């Protein structure tokens, strides 16, 4: 996708643009059906610039590219009526709480509005009642003090009740790769250990 120089500024800064010439994109649900305009689903693309597959790895290729040639990116995205796409998260990061799909990025962007929050990461942890619960790891701005009750109060009435983090932890930083990418799975695993949850419950 791309934005054009003559696209409105609000489009250029709030989306990843529209499909490029001679390529196709679609947003699909878990069953491969195209979702309605504005609804989140997996971002798929097809065309001359899309890879043919993984070198010498037919199994991985079959996971990424379906029989009709669509490459499944693993990105969660929406598309508006004018064809502008917006990436809203990663499928592997999505939390399913009590049958509701919860997108961590949405909660993270909301919590960034809190004046004391410098950075935040949202993950799902196993829960016997709801399947998964929301957990927030929060890094505060220098010199700030905050507690779980303040975060909950900030969320009340502003986001859906099932999106409010049940667990809130204040941290100095996040586990990262050598290239600086945050490793959410390590946050999740740390919470599983702390809460005494069984890994089998995450399946």
Question: Predicted segment positions?
Answer:
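Conserved ATP-binding loop and adjacent catalytic segment of the adenylate-forming AMP-binding
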Residues: 1-23, 37-41, 50-52, 62, ...
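Acidic/polar alpha-helix N-cap and adjacent early helical turns
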Residues: 189-203
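Short, positively charged
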Residues: 6-7, 150-157, 195-198
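AMP-binding/adenylate-forming catalytic core of the ANL superfamily
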Residues: 25, 31, 47-53, 60-63, ...
